[in-house]
Every structure is written in structure tokens, then in C-alpha cells.
Amino acid sequence: MTTDNSAPTASPWWSLPGKFLRREFLPVLTDLRLAIALLLIIALFSISGTVIEQGQSPAFYQSNYPEHPALFGFLTWKVIQVVGLDHVYRTWWFLSLLVLFGTSLTACTFTRQLPALKTAQRWKYYEEPRQFQKLALSAELDAGSVNSLSQILQNRRYKIFQEKDDILYARKGIVGRIGPIIVHIGIVTILLGSIWGAMTGFIAQEMVPSGETFQVKNIIDAGPLAAGQFPQDWSVRVNRFWIDYTPKGGIDQFYSDMSVLDNQGQEVDHKKIFVNQPLRYHGVTFYQTDWGISGVRVRLNKSPIFQLPMALLNTNGQGRIWGTWIPTKPDLSEGVSLLAKDLQGMVLIYDAQGKLVDTVRAGMSTQVNGVTLKVLDVVGSTGLQIKADPGIPIVYTGFGILMLGVVMSYFSHSQIWALQKGDRLYVGGKTNRAQVAFEQEVLDILERLNSQSATVINQQS
């Protein structure tokens, strides 16, 4: 009696996770349907991050996205803040989607694109006529030679491989096989730049009166690794803020003349900014986004000039207006209110009963409560949005790589084989794209080959 020892041995337990990853997880991860689904989900939430204002205060969302009635029947301020739609690009789930999408592309590159490239680089000569039958395009000629075909293919920029006079292999457009890999590298680079920017970038807002110097302090949104991006050893001075108005009184453009100062107060950069023309310094960008009125400079009788702060008043959506109050008696028992709606210098003066006393422009005086009130100037303030995104250079690099890969992918990888058997010439070829154009090219090559053969025969006769 003999014992059968051929039964398979059980695999060690530590190899099971690897087998699961290769057989179960990896095919799902590299599935094109998963990549498309992830791309659509990322695009959907990116659109939501564009439509829904990012980084605003809770009061803003409560005002613009009330519970009754809810936008689209479900979108309220509670949903926005619970899900994280007020800072989409820095939420853990959005970054996880980017990581998963990048991992899927990387796995696809190593399991499909790179093997396809290696396969394209491996080739063999066809030494039997029957091998040409499996090609998408083949022909059998009773005239012509491999050497004549080689010259024609060289003129068409094919790379020729020939070890014998009767066998030939030629190809061109191998770069088209590399293109998809470059596209994947570009997309992954863009994803890495987006993740790095979300982790290390920040957004701040400042409302700065004309003539003041400030450091970036009002951070409204920042990544967990953004502390190193905050400006520490330099500040910014708003030299002047002004608005150009149209002949009808509307705002044409608003400007800020700004200087960057070092720790010693020396100017190291200077620029006049306006909408779509920001100031950039050390990776931090200052955008002109808003404006306001910070104060009004006045004089009572022959007193020194002093500046009163002006506050934005609640008008229930009827436009913006700023106001302040100035006493006209030392015991503060009487005073008047000053109101302004723009920087054109018009100031409205109201008494304690809310009655309009006078309207003056900058530089004019008027009598109120027995004193001479002179309005010298209305001081504007510039509204700045300040951003730092260290991932932008990486994203731009990724887009450059992506565009290069797209261009490379347009090249067809075309292959041609030829075999001379006696007086018969076998020619065949295949391509990975643009099949019709390749067929036309092969027909032109065969026609050229026949014409050369006919010329040689005529010369011999």
C-alpha cells in the first residue's frame, strides 16, 4: 500500500492578505468604472464647493441657507456645516476621494499601462507566411523586395529592425503607448498638489483703513499644516484706497496702493492692486474683493482735526450705508449723526430727532447746534481676501504633464512585418488607433512598392 503525498499543502496564513489584495481588491481598484465613478463624485463636490460660499461665518449660512424653506428641499445651514460643505476641499472625505482616485490610477498604471508598454516593446520576426493571417491587415505580393520596402518605410519615419535580408519588422509611434502613462502621472501630480494645498494653505480676510499697516491675522480657513505659511516677518501697509466712479455714480473700479514692509519697516515690494490684479509676495496673494468706509475726519470750530470711526448700519437689504455720531456739547448732551454711502465725499447730517439738518461734501462746513462742523474727508477701507496655496505650482506642473501626455497619446503605434519567400513578398501590419488612416498608409506603401517593382522590370527589359 502506497501513500499519496501529492495533496496540495495549505498556504501560510501570512500570505493570505497578499492573495486577497491581488485577486480581490486589486481588480476592483483598477476597474475603469470605479475611476469614472470617483471622477464624477469629485467633480460633483467640486461644483458644490464653487456654488456654496466657502469659509464664511455660521451666521452667513444661517442667513442664506435657512431651514424653512430649505434650498432644493434639503440644503440648509445645518446640512452644510455637518457635512462640511462650507470647506469642501479640506474635509477628510473629499481628501479621501482624491487619495482613492490617485491610488486607482497608480494601480492601473502599474498593472495595465506599464505591461502594455512592455508588450509593445517586445516583438518578434514573422518567419512563416501563416503568421500574417492573424494580422488585421496583410497582403501577398508577387513583386517587390524587403529592401525596397525598408527604404519606403524609412521615408515614412518607421524604425527598421532587420537581421536578415528576407525578414523585416518596422514600427513608429511607440510614444503613443507612453502617452497614457504620462496622462496618469499628470493627474496624480494634480491630485497631490490639491491635497498639499488643502493641508498647508489658508484663507484670510482683512478690512484695512487707508493709511494703516497690518499683519495677516483674521484666518477664516486653514489646513492642519498651514501654520508655517502665515506671514511672520513682514507686514503690509495700505498707502491709499480709492474708488473710480462712472458718470452715473456707479462704481467703476476700486484700487489699493499697497507696500510690503520688512521687520525694520523698509519697503520690499509695492503694487497698486484692483480686481483681478492681486499682489503676490512669498507665496501669499492679496486680492481686492470689497471696500468700506472706516471713518470720517472732522473739525468742530477751531478744534484739532480728529477722526470718527463709522460703522455699517443695518438697512434690511436696501443698500450699504455707514454712520457715526459726534457730540456738539462737552457734556455729550447734544450731537448729530453723520451718514455716508460712498467715497464721493457726500455726508448727510441728522439731528437727534432724525431730521436731516444739512448735506455737505468733503471740505465744506455747516452750522449745527451752534457750532461749526467741518467735514474734511471720508476715509475708505479696503476689503482684502488673502490666500496661500503651496500646492498651486504642483497643480500647474501636473497640468503641464497632463497636456504632454494627451498630445503623446494622439500618436498611433503602428507595426509592419515583411517576409520574402522566393518570389513572394508577405506584408502585414496593425495599429492601436486610427485604423482607417493606417489602412490608407499601408495601401500607399504597397502601391509605391508595386510602382518601384514595375520600374525595375521595365529597366531590365
Swiss-Prot record:
Transmembrane helix listed as a keyword: yes
Record-linked InterPro entries = Cyt_c_bgen_Ccs1/CcsB/ResB, ResB-like_domain
Q: Which GO terms describe its biological process?
A: cytochrome complex assembly
Coiled coil residues, start to end: none
Q: Quick one: where is this thing mainly located?
A: membrane
What subcellular locations does the record give? Cellular thylakoid membrane
What keywords tag this UniProt record? Answer: Cytochrome c-type biogenesis, Membrane, Thylakoid, Transmembrane, Transmembrane helix
Membrane-crossing ranges are 32-52, 91-111, 178-198
Q: How does it sit in the membrane?
A: Multi-pass membrane protein
Q: Does the keyword Thylakoid apply?
A: yes
Give the record's GO CC terms.
plasma membrane-derived thylakoid membrane
Q: What does this protein do?
A: Required during biogenesis of c-type cytochromes (cytochrome c6 and cytochrome f) at the step of heme attachment.
Q: Subunit arrangement?
A: May interact with CcsA.
Which protein family is named in the record?
Belongs to the Ccs1/CcsB family.
Protein name according to UniProt:
Cytochrome c biogenesis protein CcsB
- Organism equals Nostoc sp. (strain PCC 7120 / SAG 25.82 / UTEX 2576)
